[in-house]
Structures are given as structure tokens and as C-alpha cells.
């Protein structure tokens, strides 16, 4: 990788500004899942072990009013980080000003400080100004001035956004480096796109064609096979003229689905049967229906069926690179999670056979965690939108702003 990384920096005695992604689920001050905090630990520990003084920036949720600030302080996140590091994390409930500046100047080597939620800058005195999320140049410059001309970006999850806390700071320091997590994401996702070991199979699931259409188009040019599942598959079924009952589909995307199928030929792999249910409920009456026979009126497809699972297993059997983003069914209901879980199990086999397996997106990640196989796959991406855009081959502002070696 030709980008500057944290290992290239001289950190001792330096105030090191770091952008991390601590946008964790939080309710009433209780963190639902701390995976993103854990993911940033190697870079933070490296800075501290090398006698750097770590100053952490992250956003949390969306701030649209002063009231949102009461619910979305990073204070509980700083406390959890302290537990994970086994050391005190100084938390400053400000995003600028004297209190923040003096706390940073008082930091000693090997100490860590967390700045308040960067998106507090999106609402100032009750007015929505979006200083952080619209990358206000004055704010990026100010935050950059708080450190010693060093910046580490370890927040891949926000790399597709140009914010003051990633691009803004990076543009105002002489050395902007990738943290270990960012470096890993760039390596695995970058290799999958630029130089995959073949056969390369992409699996794209989820509800809407409109959300994933660009990635499907892009991957059809790069992968040997593209498997499409989840709710979006019914738009393709409708395009084939199959009956889809009450299944989710996008009428305005049917023509596009026809075009894609015509262009892709047998490169595009679609489900051949479904688990259809008479209600959107885990205890609904269900039946297995072949796609060609169609889903009866009053029923909706909520998962791929057993023949589709077998088809996907066969498609993946000799794969050497697999990228998976999005569920095959309504994964949050146990009766419609089988297709998604079967993919997770198949990916373990691919990895055991020497293949590279990359998983991105919340539901796919949840599936491999539920199966307990996350550590048996090559890479679990921390970015949803960011990983999709990177796989599409787009330049991500958060990565583009990291210095070249």
C-alpha cells in the first residue's frame, strides 16, 4: 500500500490527532455493541506504547438539534474505552475552546484524551450549521492546530464522507497516516477489486435494488459470478415475468433489472426458489415455492429456499475470493434466516480451502457473529457504505486525504 501508515510515524512525545469510528449503538448511555471500539484498539495502543499522546475524534449518531446532544455524548464511549485499555481516558465535553486546549496541553506521553462528539459542531446555539459534516475549512484547521502536525485516520466507516474531522484535519497537517484498521480495509478490499484471486464471487443481498444497483453493475465487470439475494431479488423475478405475490419489489427498477440480466448472462446468479409467508411475521404460515411457479397472491418471499441454498453452495464451492454484503432474507426473524446463515457457513469452507472471504454490512456481519465464525473468515469490514463505494472503485475522500509514502 502506497499510503503512509501509523508504523511510518515518529510518535514519541507528540500530540497525535486520531479519527476513530466510535459510532456505536447507544441507548440511555448504555452501549449495545462495542465492536467498533475494539476494532480501533490496536492503533490506539500502538500510539500509547510508542509514547505518543493520543487525541481521539469520533462522531456518534446525527445531531439535528440541541436536544440530540443530551442523548449522544461520547462520555459513555470514553468510559468503555478506558475499561478496554485498562487506563484512564480523559474526556472533554467540548469540541473547541480553552477547556479542550488546556486538557490537550496537559497530556503526558502514553496518555489518551477523547474529544466530545464531532457532530456537536453541526448544531451551534440551536442553529443547524453542519460544520463537521460539510467539512467547514475553519473547523478542520482549528482541530489540526491542536496536535503536532500528525494525524491518523482509522475510521474506515466514514471514509466515504468528507468531514472536518477526517478530510479537514488531514488537509492541514504534513503527515496524515492510515491506522492499522484502515490499512487492513484498504488492503483486503483494494485487492479484491484490483487483483482478486479467481474465481471471484460477489454476493449482494438486502432489500432494495436502488441501494445496491451501482455495486452490482460494477461487480459484474469484475467478478466471475455475482449472486443477488434478499428482497432485491424479487425485482429481478418480476422482470422475468414471474409472479411475486406481495413480495417487496421496485416497479421503477424492473426495466433496469431486465437490462442487467441481458448484459450479465449466466454471470448473474439469482435465487430459484423462496420461502414464502402469508404475513411479515416469524410465525407466519410458510411454503417453499419455485421461482418459475411464482409466489401466490397473499404471500411474500422472505428468504431463499433450499434449492437456492444448494445453487449458492455450488457457485461458491471453487471460489478463491468472495465478497459478501447483505442478507439473503429477513435475517432478524429466525425462520427466515436460514439462507443468510448458510452463506456464512459456506464462507468458512471457502476460507478453509485457502480462499479470501470478506464480509461487509451490518446484517451480514451479524450473521457471521451469530454463527460464531467471524474469526474463521479473512476480513470483516467495519464500513457499510464505505466498503460498498470502495468495491465500486470510487475514490473515498477519507482515504484520498491520507498522505502518500
UniProtKB/Swiss-Prot annotation:
Primary location recorded for the protein, binned into one broad class: cytoplasm
Reaction equations catalysed: (2R)-3-phosphoglycerate + ATP = (2R)-3-phospho-glyceroyl phosphate + ADP
Entries under InterPro entries matching the protein: Phosphoglycerate_kinase, Phosphoglycerate_kinase_CS, Phosphoglycerate_kinase_N, Phosphoglycerate_kinase_sf
Binding residues for ATP: 212, 301, 332, 361-364
Localization (cell): Cytoplasm
GO biological process assignments: gluconeogenesis; glycolytic process
Pfam families noted in UniProt: PGK
HAMAP family reported for this sequence: Phosphoglyc_kinase
Subunit structure: Monomer.
Protein name: Phosphoglycerate kinase
Protein species of origin: Leuconostoc mesenteroides subsp. mesenteroides (strain ATCC 8293 / DSM 20343 / BCRC 11652 / CCM 1803 / JCM 6124 / NCDO 523 / NBRC 100496 / NCIMB 8023 / NCTC 12954 / NRRL B-1118 / 37Y)
Amino acid at each position: 500500500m502506497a499510503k503512509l501508515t501509523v508504523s511510518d510515524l515518529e510518535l514519541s512525545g507528540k500530540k497525535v490527532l486520531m479519527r476513530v469510528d466510535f459510532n456505536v449503538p447507544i441507548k440511555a448511555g448504555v452501549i449495545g455493541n462495542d465492536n467498533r471500539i475494539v476494532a480501533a484498539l490496536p492503533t490506539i495502543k500502538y500510539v500509547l506504547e510508542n509514547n505518543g499522546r493520543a487525541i481521539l475524534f469520533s462522531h456518534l449518531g446525527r445531531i439535528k438539534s440541541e436536544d440530540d446532544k443530551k442523548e449522544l455524548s461520547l462520555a459513555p464511549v470514553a468510559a468503555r474505552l478506558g475499561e478496554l485499555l485498562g487506563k484512564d481516558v480523559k474526556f472533554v465535553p467540548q469540541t473547541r475552546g480553552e477547556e479542550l486546549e488546556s486538557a490537550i496541553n496537559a497530556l503526558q506521553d502514553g496518555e489518551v484524551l477523547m474529544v466530545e462528539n464531532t457532530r456537536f459542531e453541526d448544531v451551534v446555539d440551536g442553529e443547524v450549521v453542519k460544520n463537521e459534516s460539510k467539512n467547514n475549512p475553519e473547523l478542520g484547521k482549528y482541530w489540526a492546530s491542536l496536535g503536532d502536525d500528525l494525524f491518523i485516520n482509522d475510521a474506515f466507516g466514514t471514509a466515504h464522507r468528507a468531514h472536518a474531522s477526517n478530510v479537514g484535519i488531514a488537509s492541514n497537517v504534513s503527515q496524515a497516516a492510515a491506522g492499522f484498521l484502515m490499512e487492513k480495509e484498504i488492503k483486503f478490499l483494494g485487492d479484491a477489486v484490483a487483483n482478486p484471486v479467481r474465481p471471484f464471487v460477489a454476493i449482494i443481498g438486502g432489500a432494495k435494488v436502488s441501494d445496491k444497483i451501482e455495486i452490482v453493475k460494477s461487480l459484474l465487470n469484475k467478478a466471475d459470478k455475482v449472486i443477488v439475494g434478499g428482497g432485491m431479488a424479487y425485482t429481478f423475478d418480476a422482470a422475468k415475468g414471474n409472479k411475486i405475490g406481495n413480495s417487496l419489489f421496485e416497479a421503477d427498477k424492473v426495466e433496469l433489472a431486465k437490462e442487467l440480466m441481458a448484459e450479465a448472462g449466466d454471470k448473474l446468479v439469482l435465487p430459484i426458489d423462496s420461502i414464502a409467508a402469508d404475513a411479515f411475521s416469524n410465525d407466519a404460515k410458510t411454503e417453499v415455492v419455485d421461482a418459475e411457479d411464482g409466489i401466490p397472491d397473499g404471500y411474500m418471499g422472505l428468504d431463499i429456499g433450499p434449492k437456492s441454498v444448494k445453487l449458492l453452495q455450488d457457485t461458491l464451492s471453487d471460489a478463491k475470493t468472495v465478497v459478501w454484503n447483505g442478507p439473503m432474507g429477513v435475517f432478524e426473524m429466525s425462520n427466515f434466516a436460514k439462507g443468510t446463515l448458510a452463506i456464512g457457513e459456506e464462507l468458512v469452507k471457502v476460507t478453509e480451502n485457502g480462499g479470501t472471504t470478506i464480509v461487509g454490512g451490518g446484517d451480514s456481519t451479524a450473521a457471521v457473529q451469530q454463527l460464531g465464525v467471524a474469526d474463521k473468515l479473512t476480513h470483516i469490514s467495519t464500513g457499510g457504505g464505505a466498503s460498498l463505494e470502495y468495491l465500486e472503485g470510487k475514490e473515498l475522500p477519507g482515504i484520498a486525504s491520507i498522505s502518500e509514502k
